[in-house]
A protein has these predicted regions:
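Outer-membrane pore/translocation modules
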Residues: 137-138, 142-160, 165-166
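Outer membrane beta-barrel
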Residues: 1-13, 17-144, 169-176
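Extracellular loop and loop/strand-boundary signature of outer-membrane beta-barrel proteins
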Residues: 15-18, 109-110, 147-154, 225-231
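A short, polar/proline- and glycine-enriched secondary-structure boundary/capping micro-motif
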Residues: 93-97, 146-148, 188-191, 217-219
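Glycine-rich, flexible loop segments associated with nucleotide phosphate handling
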Residues: 1, 64-70, 155-163, 232-234
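Detector for outer-membrane/organellar transmembrane beta-barrel domains
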Residues: 159-241
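Solvent-exposed loop/turn segments connecting transmembrane beta-strands
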Residues: 17-19, 114-120, 158-160, 184-191
């Protein structure tokens, strides 16, 4: 079993506002373990808690999610890895490889309205690394629409749906190429797709990504940003050097 984590905090001051505590990366404490089953198979698990260091509250604003950073079990095989539970979302995880700030600070690439860092009730598959090429896929079960959400508004609107995603990533150390397509569960079948790449010359790395969002007004059983902003479709281009 491996115990891991990060503790990050700082003090910031903005003109016209009081001095306050903040962070560049969220603090976390996690537990990760594997058990060799022989013949190329292994069992695995992950539990990761996220917290706000300044007051000890749960990171993410939802006190009902104790293991915000991940809660899953899985099995590794010669044919790939299978995990079940709360896992990292493929489009966010892969696109982060193009961002030196890991999409987690003021200079990071902006998340779209239909991308999430983690997704629940999910079966995830990751292929073996084949000379730099990896393929991933997820299938997410929608929520139980019989009383598990606030007033069942999304169910009555017909916005409840299962979710799935596919990802292709190639990285040989110098060249990185990737593509994703994703539909979140309980999003009224909203979806995003993105393409990106990077090239490294010694210590210099240039990256570019394009993302297209089709937001139908729901985001994981909650009304999305497009409900209030009037923006249902958006495109995003990011470049980082």
């Amino acid at each position: 079993v491996t115990v891991y984590g990060i503790v990050d905090t700082g003090v910031a001051k903005q003109t016209g506002k009081d001095t306050y505590m903040t962070h560049n990366y969220e603090s976390s404490l996690g537990f990760r373990g594997t058990e060799d089953l022989g013949n190329g198979y292994k069992a695995m698990f992950q539990l990761e808690h996220r917290l706000n260091l300044n007051d000890g509250t749960v990171y993410g604003g939802n006190p009902d999610i104790d293991w915000y950073g991940g809660a899953n079990v899985g099995i590794g095989t010669p044919f790939g890895t299978f995990r079940l539970g709360r896992v990292d979302e493929l489009p966010t995880e892969t696109l982060r490889t193009l961002d030196p700030f890991n999409q987690d600070s003021i200079a990071s690439m902006t998340l779209s309205t239909q991308r999430s860092t983690h997704i629940d009730n999910t079966i995830r598959y990751d292929s073996p690394n084949l000379s730099g090429l990896q393929i991933g896929a997820t299938y997410s079960l929608g929520k139980n629409t019989k009383g598990s959400d606030r007033d069942n508004a999304f169910a009555r609107a017909g916005a409840d749906n299962d979710g799935y995603a596919g990802s292709v990533l190639y990285d040989n150390g110098t060249v990185t190429l990737l593509g994703n397509w994703s539909r979140l569960a309980d999003s009224n079948k909203s979806y995003i797709w993105n393409l990106g790449g990077a090239y490294a010359w010694g210590p210099l790395r240039l990256s570019l990504a394009y993302e297209k969002t089709h937001d139908k007004g729901w985001y994981n059983a909650e009304r999305s940003l497009s409900e209030n902003s009037g923006v249902a479709d958006s495109s995003l281009i990011n470049g980082v050097a």
